[in-house]
Amino acid sequence: KDAGNYGDKTFLKSLPGEGWSGSLAEYDDGAARTAPVASYAANRLGIFDLGGNVWQWCEDEYKASMNAPDVLKEYPVLEKEKASDGTAFRVLRGASWLNNDPLTLRSSFRNYDYPGFRSGIRGFRCVLVVSGR
């Protein structure tokens, strides 16, 4: 339960008969969808929730070169950098409660979407600066 909120046993149980499977079938973070802030252990820098829960919108325009060659081979759709209307996609990072493929769980993995697209697997990671740290 220390890694974060990803597509796991609890998620799979919430979708009976859907035919979902995945490489995280033995992992169980206890949340079927989004989890409250700080539900999982902080990293070595004391930062919570950098992986899983929801994809984090970033200001950066997406570029295919941001991903490693093995990622682009597995997900050729990530070669696309703009929408059909010419709008540049924006970067999404951190994976979500829906993801269970080890490639998409890498901190280096970049996903993308149309700016302003909304869904239950995309959002923001809020930061609180603690004085004296």
Language model segments and positions:
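Functional-site microenvironments in short loops/helix caps that host divalent-cation chemistry
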Residues: K1-N111, G120
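Short, structured beta-strand segments at or near domain termini in extracellular proteins/domains
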Residues: S119-R133
